[in-house]
Every structure is written in structure tokens, then in C-alpha cells.
Amino acid sequence: MLKLFSAFRKDKIWDFDGGIHPPEMKTQSNGTPLRQVPLAPRFVIPLKQHIGAEGELCVSVGDRVLRGQALTRGRGRMLPVHAPTSGTVIAIAPHSTAHPSALAELSVIIDADGEDRWIEREGWSDYRAHSREALIERIHQYGVAGLGGAGFPTGVKLQGGGDKITTLIINAAECEPYITADDRLMQDCAAQIVEGIRILAHILQPREVLIGIEDNKPQAISMLRAVLADAHDISLRVIPTKYPSGGAKQLTQILTGKQVPHGGRSSDIGVLMQNVGTAYAVKRAVVDGEPITERVVTLTGEAVSRPGNVWARLGTPVRHLLNDAGFCPSADQMVIMGGPLMGFTLPWLDVPVVKITNCLLAPSVTEMGAPQEEKSCIRCSACADACPADLLPQQLYWFSKGQQHDKATAHHIADCIECGACAWVCPSNIPLVQYFRQEKAEINAIRLEEKRAAEAKARFEARQARLEREKAVRLARHKSAAVQPAAKDQDAIAAALARVKEKQAQATQPVVIQAGSLPDNSAVIAAREARKAQARAKQAAHPVADSALPGDDPRKAAVEAAIARAKARKQEQQAGSEPAEPVDPRKAAVEAAIARAKARKQEQQAGSEPVEAVDPRKAAVEAAIARAKARKQEQQAGGEPAEAVDPRKAAVEAAIARAKARKQEQQAGSEPAEPAAPRKAAVEAAIARAKARKQEQQAGSEPAEAVDPRKAAVAAAIARVQAKKAAQQQVVNED
């Protein structure tokens, strides 16, 4: 009884909610065997014929290629594409592709040479001798993708399944009206399909392998049963005809009774599904070593005279295939790629056949019927009853039309399989699937933009963190460089420190000052006082300071000379006589200096106290006052003003007179007041100059060039400084 119950459960099938039963038009094309189509003169191969990114080009314009040669490299989800025939690459440029809007995608354009030569093929007849990874890599590099319509890379799908897969399902339902590509392939190539299924089972190692096929394909069912007569590892399940039984989620529920969760995949419940056409392509890639370069395409519709299924090379223009089938277009002829429910109308016929192209439908006007006008929704809920995904198409329609993306997402619009059952039953002729496709495209665009923004933010934050780390490292490096000198500078620094220590050792012992106490400067103070006492003793023993004597002031002498000249002029004016030759101020200054020297000598002999030194500034002021008074008296007398007395010249002459007086004193045996070595030379030079000028004036000759009073004053000052310096040096030597 238990075995009978297990056998009953083994063949049990389930059902799904919703679904429709449209009229079938499969008999138009499934009655004739597969046939080859003549090669087109030109092929357009889009680089992206699958879900994922396009591969990297490995050919260039002008290259000659062979059939099966890779045109791109595949990494990750990038699936390579291959040349459908031998020929020459004439262009690599964007070209319109199989898309409702005929979007242009980068394509390789090849001119066929008609030879159709293959690359060197290497098949793995004993595929069991190769590892699972090697088989998956071969399937991927040979460009095998899901041929049922999704176009997902088969190698990536097998790799992602891993050890989670317990059930492998082969989809042979082909529920779409008009399409018979899989039906005809199973009738003509059943053995190759089963071999491909066994390769997939060898890779995945599932517990069971199920083939699901609708009961409207009796010839295909009989062919598969004949091939599987002795097989116990593959089970054939015949299911009732119902649209859309061929959907992945619907067929999974029919064969296993399990439902794929919202937003999930069939692999989440241990199920992996492949199409019969994909199984056939896997067999050719692994066993025969042939990349996918062609597929079965159904050519049907009342607008073609020879409907059927053909082997169409990838990249063949749609126009070329339809012309081979006897295409007779009408005035407003449409061509649908895919079935009447899930397909889309082509904008023009120059688009190429790609891996997901399974049908080209060219219906007549009577076959499709007149286009119906879209009306308002009457809320009849017929769409909800027909939806196989348990969605609410009415609500999704309002959300899509009102651009309410959040609500549409919350109502699981992503689970819509776009089967078209809702639009088929809608009494208002609302193209619901078009609204849903547009809404999903907008949601995907928003998510893509959000993803890009998040990636940009992550890059910015990573950059900021990197800059902060670099700044911290840079500051630490600068800090360590400032604190710790480089290794190569250690020797130089050590040598400098050694020299400093050596100098400190040779120098006198430094004064050490204790913290909180005053320095002991008693020794320095005592030495300074001793030097001062010694200097005072020397000054008392040798009174030198000639300039300190009252009569030694040149300015006072100049004042006296000016006063003498003024008195002389006044006496002359009172006598009424003509003024004689003006009194020479230099001579008067010399006489005054001689008089002062004599008076000084008498004072020294008498032992009197020295007179207080005359302030030179005060003497200069008095001299200036005397000169001003003399000029005023001259002006009052009406006489010509005498020559202005130059105080600097008078000072020089006074210095000369003092020098003569000292010389006379020294000759008379008196004690010299100060050494005359340098001063004597300066005085003699000044005397010589004065005598020369005096002789010139007495001879009545032309007056010589006037002596610059500033130069004379400077010379006299230099002479005095030199004399004082010599006197001080002599005192030091005597000590």
C-alpha cells in the first residue's frame, strides 16, 4: 500500500490559480520538419543577447572570421557571442536590435563569404571524465543561454545552483499560441535533448529530473517516451494545456506543488529549470564542441505562404527569414517577435535574430482582428481572476498610470510575468501589460539611479577616509622627522656635541646658580673696583686732559677773537679814518691762544687750582652772540661788513696756537702736559697751511681757493682725537 501511495504521489501534478485557454494555432507550423535557411549575405550580431553586460570585443574591422569563432570574451555574466558563419568583419557599430523600441546596441557586422567554414571543433564525448567546473566553464564560453525567452546565462545559472538543487525541471510546455519551435525540436532531436539533460543532471546531481510537457504535443510526447523507455533517472510529466503553464513559477507549482516566494527564485526552494532548447545547445557545446550559432525559429501566420520551423543563424535579418517563408505583406502589415500574448511588434524588419528569438508571427488583418479602442476600467475583476501570479492587475494599473511607484512595488509588480492573460480577458481593451512593462522599467531606472548615487557616496566617503589617513600618516611622518633626525645625520650631530663638550671642558668653570638663590658676583665686582682705583691713581699722577682746561676750548677762543675784531672795527669807525685791512681772525685766534697758554703756565707755577672747564656748547653760544653784536654795530655805523669769522677756522688756529705754546713750555723745561707724537704732526701740518695762506695774503696776490671750513674743522677734530688716543696709549705704556 505504501509503494502504491508513493507511486501515486510520484506522478501527481498540481494546478495554479488563474490562467486562460486561448485558441491554439500550432497546427500551422508543427506539421513540417525542421529545415535550413540559405545564408544571408550580411549578418548583424549584437554583443548583448542575454541578461547581463556585453562581452569584451576580441575582433576588429577587417578581420576574417570562421563559424564558431568568438567575437567577444565572457567574464562573469558577460556571455560571449560567436560568428554565425565565415566571412569578414566590415563594421563594429550600433544597430537596431530585437526590442519593442528597436534600441540600437553595439553589434559586429559580418559579410558572409558563402563558404561557411567552421573553426576546429573539439568535443568531449566522455563528458563524465571532466570536472563540474570544467563543464560549466565550457558551457559558458560557448555562449549557451536560456533559449526559452529569458536569456539568462546557463553557466552562471548552473554555478549559482550549487548543492542546493534537489529537482531539475526541463520546460517543454511551450504554452504560447502559434509557437511550435520546442515541439518540432523534440520531434526531430529527442535523443540529443535527452543527452543534454543528462549532462545537466551530471553537473547538478539532483535527486529527481522532471520533464513537463503539455498534452497538446502528442508526437513530441511519443518521441520522448521512446527515448526514455529504458531510463529511470528522468521522469516525463504530461500536464493539461493551460496558458501560461510554461511560466517558470507556474510549471514549478504544477510539478512539485511548491510556490516560489515573492521576490525569490526557484533555487530558493531547491528547483532549477531549463528549456529543452537549452538542453540541446548544452549537448552541442559539450559533446560536439560547437558554440551556439543557430537556433530553431517558428515562422507562422497567414501572411506567410510556407510556415514552419527553421534553423536560423544568429544575426540573420528578420526580412531574410520571412522572404524565405514566402512573406506577403499587406498595407498595414505587422510582424510580431514572439507569441501573440507575450511578444512585441517590430518597428521594422532589419533587426537580427538573437538567442531569445523563438517565433516570427506575420498575421493577416482578419487573423488579428480590427484594433479595439481602449476604454475606462469597469472594475469587473476579470483580470484578477485570470492572473496566474495572484496579483491585482486593476490596482497595479492605477498605480502605474498614476506614477505611484512605491505602491506598485508594495503590490508586487515585480512578480508579474507579463503573460498577457489580464489584457486578454479585459472587456475594456486596456493594454495592461504595456502599462506594467513601462512601470517596471521606470522602477528599475529609479533603483539604478539610487544604486549609482549610493556607489558615488561610498566612493566619496572612501576617498575622504583615504585622504584623512594620508593626512594622518603625513603629519606623523613630519612629526617623527622633526623629533628624530635621520640616521645619516646622527654622526654629524654626535661630532658637534663632542666638540661643544670639549670646548666647555677647556673653558673656565661656569658659575652655577642654585634655584631660588641670587648669583655670586663678588669676584667680578672686586675686579671692577680694583680697575677703577688703578685708573684714578694714574689720572692723579699724570693730569692730561688738556681739553678739560678752560683755555683749551676753541669755541671760547673764537668768541674772544670775534670780540677783539669787533672792538678794533669800532675804534676805526670812531676815528673816522678809512678802514684798514680787516683784522685776520686767524691771527687773533693765535694771539689769544698764546695769551691763554702763558696764563696757564703762570697758574701752574703758582700752584693754583685748575679753573672749571668751560662748557663748549655755552662758549659756542657766546661766540655766536658776540658775532651778532659786532655785525649789528657795523651795520649801525654804515660801514661795509667785515668778512664773517668762521668759527671752525678760528678753532683750528687756536689749536695751532696751543700746540706752539706747549712746545715752548717743553723747551723751557716744564713737564709735558701730554705726549706730542701724533698731535705734533697734525699741529705742524695745520701751522704750515696757515703760514702759506698768510704769505699769500700779505703778498697781495690773487686770493687762493677758499679753504673749506668743514674740512678744516674735520681735520682739527681728527687731530685732537689722535692726540688724545696717543696720550692715553702713552699713559698705559708708562704704567
Swiss-Prot record:
Compartments where located: Cell inner membrane
Function: Part of a membrane-bound complex that couples electron transfer with translocation of ions across the membrane. Required to maintain the reduced state of SoxR.
Keyword Nucleotidyltransferase: no
Protein's membrane topology: Peripheral membrane protein
GO cellular component, one term: plasma membrane
A Pfam family the protein falls into: SLBB
Binding site for [4Fe-4S] cluster 2: 387, 416, 419, 422
Chief localization: membrane
Gene3D superfamilies per the UniProt record, alphabetical: 3.30.70.20, NADH-ubiquinone oxidoreductase 51kDa subunit (3.40.50.11540)
Family to which this protein belongs: Belongs to the 4Fe4S bacterial-type ferredoxin family. RnfC subfamily.
Organism for this UniProt entry: Salmonella paratyphi B (strain ATCC BAA-1250 / SPB7)
Record has Cell inner membrane as a keyword: yes
Superkingdom, natural source: Bacteria
Enzyme Commission number: 7.-.-.-
Region (Disordered): 534-715
HAMAP family: RsxC_RnfC
Protein's recorded name: Ion-translocating oxidoreductase complex subunit C
Cofactor info, note text: Binds 2 [4Fe-4S] clusters per subunit.
Cofactor requirements of the protein: [4Fe-4S] cluster
